[in-house]
Amino acid sequence: GLFSVVTGVLKAVGKNVAKNVGGSLLEQLKCKISGGC
């Protein structure tokens, strides 16, 4: 029903947010390691 749809949307959004946050953290780490900040 509607609840499962909402749950699915929230999970998808959560995955995207986690991916974006993780990606930016990785970029910052690469930047610091390479000294290009």
From Swiss-Prot:
It is found in: Secreted. It holds the Pfam family Antimicrobial_2. One of its GO terms (cellular component) is extracellular region. Keywords: Amphibian defense peptide, Antibiotic, Antimicrobial, Disulfide bond, Secreted. Disulfide bonds join C31-C37. Expressed by the skin glands. Antimicrobial peptide. Active against the Gram-positive bacterium S.aureus (MIC=15 uM) and the Gram-negative bacterium E.coli (MIC=30 uM). Belongs to the frog skin active peptide (FSAP) family. Brevinin subfamily. This is Brevinin-2DYe.
